[in-house]
């Protein structure tokens, strides 16, 4: 059962409570390239990104934040490290949320200045704890970025913001070690009702990043923990968005758009099952209808394995049986099985 947290409004998206889990990503174009950032932001929006983070190393770089915000219709989060004046500049240009890393933002007075700027414009703050940048005294106390250390860091900064009468807060508590990350989120969720941004940081190269994020983020969601997610990949941010939605689908959340399932194939396969499945998925990119499509390797187990699909095929030599909701309907034959199948999909 989902652990319900207080609601926080980020631009036109509300997280927490019973609101849908929002999928985030972060631009990776150098901040000096404003045109490149705007173009990438538009691609992320088209891919379904719901909350978009942009780095802001200095106050002067707030102009990139402003340009991106004016170019898309999704909330923009300013990612702030070291320079609290960058956060103040982003608040001035109307950013929708500010993320600060407590380990490097500076002393309490600087945090207070950021809080006051956000209070004036009702801008939420994400406390972004990262296992790689814990405060020195906390790291010295625990010896390593163990879950208890990360939770202590997060709660210290929550209490600091609360001391300044600020509670428009989101928390993340990321680690590249999946078991540590999961245990940290469990401990944090047990002691706070602020919404949680869930992710695995420094997850590795693309394939390993997918695996670690699937295990870490998916595992947390299955435990009812998480209000917004970001899949960190060494890839274009659009791929992070796609992966985020796939994780939500995999753990049972209703997600708009099609899901393509296929079998791993075996020696019984007599038609290009994998190639057809990949092409079906490619052609259905951007298709908004929520349907499950199955492409199965043979008629032995195919229909049974894909019984819960809305539509599917199970192939044979030069033909494929079309089934709808697990029931065989007709045979598709010839050299254009894929095209015939796509025609049937669009009828569903």
Model-derived segments and spans:
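Hydrophobic faces of well-ordered beta-strands that scaffold small-molecule active sites
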Residues: 21-27, 52-54, 76-80, 98-100, ...
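Hydrophobic or amphipathic alpha-helical targeting/insertion segments
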Residues: 85-126
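Catalytic alpha/beta core domains of metabolic enzymes, predominantly
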Residues: 129-133, 138-285
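N-terminal amphipathic alpha-helix/helix-capping segment at the start of soluble metabolic enzymes
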Residues: 1-26, 119, 282
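Alpha-helix-loop-beta-strand connector modules within alpha/beta enzyme cores
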Residues: 59-80, 113-125, 185-196, 280-284
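Active-site mouth loops of central-metabolism enzymes
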Residues: 18-36, 55, 74-82, 138-151, ...
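Glycine-enriched alpha-helix->loop->beta-strand junction motifs that scaffold or abut catalytic
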Residues: 71-74, 92-98, 119-122, 189-195, ...
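Glycine-rich, proline-tolerant flexible connector loops at the mouths of alpha/beta enzymes
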Residues: 34, 45-69, 99-107, 169-178
